[in-house]
C-alpha cells in the first residue's frame, strides 16, 4: 500500500507479538465457580467458542489487524474466514499461506481460510451468512454502521474498529520536543491514513506560537518518496481520495 519499510517491518513484528500474547492468554480463558443455594452443589460458568467468524480487514494495516483477530479468535476455539482488502491482496495471500502452513504443521487443518474479493461481492455475504456467528470489521465509520445493522439484524455479533478524529492536548508544561516528535509522526505516518492518525492539536495559548513555528519547520524536513529508502517518512498515498 506504499507503507515505508520500517512500518511494514513493525506490522509483521506486531503479528508475531500478538501470537505470543495469544499463547499466554490461551491458558487464562476460564469461567466462574459460583456457590449454589443447594447444599453440596456449585455452579460453573464456562466460555464456549462462537464457532465460525469472519474477519474483514482494511488496506492500511493488511497484516497486523488480521493478526489481532486471527490469533485471539483461534485460541478461543473458533474457525475463521479472512477477507483482506482487495487492494492489498498479495499481503493477504502471503500471510494466509504462512499462517496456514504453521497451523497444518501443528495438526490444525481447515481452521483458517482466506478469500478475496470486493466488499460488495464478498463482504456482504459475510454479513448475511448465519454460519458466521461474529463478523469483525475494520474500516470506515460509514461502512461500520452498515455492518452493525446487517449483522445485528440476524442476531450475530460484531467487532468494529472504525475511523477516528483524534486530537492531542498540549498544556503549558508540556515537553515540546516530545510533542513535536510525536505529533509529526502521528499525523504524517502511514501518509495520515490510519484510524489513529492525529488530526487536531489543541494547544494552550501560552505555547501556541512557539509550537506552531517549530511544527512548520519540522514539516519542511519531512521526506516524501521511495518507501524503501530508510530516510523516507511518507511514501505514496494508497488512493487519491
Map each language-model feature to its residues.
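Short histidine/acidic/glycine/proline-rich micro-motifs that form metal-
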Residues: 3-5, 86-89, 201
Amino acid at each position: 500500500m506504499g507503507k515505508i519499510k520500517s512500518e511494514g517491518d513493525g506490522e509483521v513484528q506486531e503479528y508475531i507479538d500478538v501470537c505470543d500474547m495469544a499463547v499466554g492468554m490461551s491458558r487464562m480463558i476460564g469461567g466462574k465457580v459460583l456457590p449454589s443455594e443447594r447444599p453440596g452443589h456449585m455452579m460453573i460458568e464456562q466460555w464456549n467458542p462462537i464457532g465460525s467468524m469472519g474477519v474483514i480487514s482494511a488496506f492500511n494495516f493488511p497484516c497486523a489487524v488480521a493478526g489481532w483477530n486471527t490469533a485471539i479468535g483461534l485460541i478461543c476455539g473458533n474457525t475463521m474466514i479472512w477477507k483482506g482488502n482487495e487492494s492489498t491482496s498479495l499481503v493477504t495471500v502471503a500471510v494466509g499461506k504462512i499462517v496456514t502452513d504453521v497451523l497444518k504443521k501443528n495438526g490444525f487443518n481447515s481452521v483458517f481460510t482466506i478469500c478475496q474479493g470486493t466488499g460488495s461481492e464478498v463482504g456482504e455475504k459475510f454479513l448475511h451468512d448465519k454460519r458466521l456467528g461474529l463478523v469483525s470489521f475494520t474500516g470506515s465509520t460509514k461502512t461500520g454502521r452498515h455492518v452493525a445493522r446487517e449483522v445485528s439484524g440476524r442476531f450475530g455479533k460484531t467487532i468494529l474498529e472504525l475511523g477516528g478524529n483524534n486530537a492531542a492536548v498540549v498544556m503549558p508544561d508540556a515537553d515540546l520536543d516530545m510533542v513535536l516528535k510525536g505529533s509529526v509522526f502521528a499525523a504524517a505516518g502511514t501518509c495520515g491514513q490510519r484510524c489513529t492518525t492525529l488530526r487536531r492539536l489543541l494547544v494552550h495559548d501560552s505555547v501556541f506560537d512557539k509550537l506552531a513555528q517549530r511544527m512548520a519547520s519540522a514539516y519542511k524536513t519531512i521526506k516524501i518518496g521511495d518507501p524503501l529508502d530508510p530516510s523516507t517518512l511518507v511514501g505514496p498515498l494508497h488512493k487519491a481520495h
